[in-house]
Amino acid sequence: MKRIIKVTSITILAVILIGYLIPERKAMPCCTPADYNHNTFWYWPWTRGTSGCPHTGVDIFGKVGAPVVSQTGGLVLYAKDMPGKAGKSVFVLGPKWRIHEYLHLHTIDTEFLDFVKPGEQIATLGKSGNAASTPAHVHYGIITPIPYVWRAFGTAGTCNPPKRFNWRLMFWLNPTDHLPTK
């Protein structure tokens, strides 16, 4: 029994480490770096009132129907309409075990469990979900299921929310640190 636990633990650790060693090739998900505000990650209050959550990504603006490409290569974990705020959405598991989310899409051009390459079209820009009254955009965010514990004690964004939200920083990475700047 101890041997099984030891082998299983080593295997899980090896898989996690391999995921972190895979190089991350990057592409701009949509449009150009000039089409998003670099200071909107963790902006608060993002929703009406002061009880809303901080903004967990950046909104990249463009025209309805503009191509949205995968920022990195990976496995599509979700590709369908998500009722409520997100609308049509795609989630891609990429290197370093990061989940890249693309929300408010017009069309979805990939399917669950597809492998995508960096720069491969996965959707088109839209206004779905709670973005119907805003200019067309893709909300792009990066989630890490393996928490970065040290981030819970820091701050992010240009308008720091109440500390009750800081634990979420362990799981949400600032997309502007991973997008091209030019």
Provide a role label for each language-model segment:
Residues 61, 93-95, 143:
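A generic structural motif
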Residues 58, 66, 98-100, 108, ...:
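Glycine-centered loop/turn positions within well-structured domains
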Residues 5-13:
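Sec-dependent signal peptide hydrophobic core
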Residues 2, 14-88, 118, 127, ...:
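Surface-exposed, glycine-biased beta-strand/turn segments
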Residues 125-139:
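Active-site loop architecture of trypsin-fold serine endopeptidases
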Residues 70-109, 135-139:
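Zn2+-dependent peptidoglycan hydrolase active-site motif and core
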